[in-house]
Amino acid sequence: MDELTIKRVKTGLADPAIGPETIALMLTDTCNLSCVYCRGGRIDEGRGKAEESELTTEELFRLFEDAAGFKVKEVNIGGMRGEPFCKKDIRLILRKIKSLGLMGSMTTNGSMLSGALAEEMSSYGWDILLLSLDAPFARLQHQLRPAVNGKEYFHNILEFLGALNDNPGSRIRILVNMVITGNNYRYFPEMVNFVNNYRNIESLNVLRLVDMGLPGYSDLQLDCGQAAEFRETLEAFKREKKVLYAGNWSSPDVRREMPAGRHTRCFTNYYILSIAANGDVLFCPQQYKAVSGLNIRDVRLRDLWLNEHFSFRKILSESAPCYGECCTILRKQNEEIYNAVCDG
């Protein structure tokens, strides 16, 4: 984690006027895939009309301009509930972010990527693309993340990555997120080989399956035997520079790995401001729960950050009940901040 981020959090704990480093924006609630472990809005469920309640392009541009003026470093376009490329004017939105000198990162399912898009995004200097890819080949990817319209799309991902490979001037950093299930864990070695074929892929982030209340969760989760087998696989690849994961995978359930008495303090909201597609402020970029009384439509960014409703940040920094379900990246960042703030 960047030392400047840690310093910003330490200062922000004492001075509420220190703004966020990152705006985590859930751009749309509409998605063109029907992933087996996702509860997001799909086009076939009538969520295509969700744009009516979402922030308009003009409102988004105002937010980005406010962010640049508030010394925000990065706009992170999330994919928790929807696919960013389903958003109207998405290409204009990405260009606007970069035109203001902001760092741009985005999570995508990859289904709407193309070689032409790789060239376009490279031309205006897009920074990071987090690609949700759970298999190194089409059949399994389409099984785990099928398209609503039934069409195959894996070739679009290959075309995008291939175009980046062929463009030595492209600086787009690709972070591949792989959710481990009983269906794909045995293909992890092939996945490592896959990411090593592409220069722009910086990391393969190994993610646990999160229980989102879906009926098929138990069928997808690793059983104890599979978890032990996968742990041995991870051990074999521990020297692989691109492979990143949290915990020791001693249990299928990450919460069982947490030692008794381990801290559950979350500092995320001191450097990340999470905003839903309709403008509501969220408690966390991983927990889609709105903070009552806070919407970016009603107030400018600087004033919103100083609102009294943000007292929830201090509560979570003392104890966060959702800490055990946190994603790999945020848990690692929280560990570093905790060590610097509480032990340093």
Task: Please place each PLM-identified region on the residue numbering.
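Flexible mid-to-C-terminal extensions adjoining Fe-S/redox cofactors in radical SAM and related proteins
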Residues: 1-19, 41, 260-263, 280-344
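Residue-level signal for threonine
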Residues: 114, 247, 307
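Radical SAM enzyme [4Fe-4S]-AdoMet core and its adjacent flexible, acidic
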Residues: 4, 26, 46-50, 55, ...
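The −1 position to Zn-ligating cysteines in a subset of zinc-ribbon hairpins
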Residues: 30, 34, 265, 321
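Conserved alpha-helical substructure of the radical SAM core
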Residues: 1-128, 143, 147, 155, ...
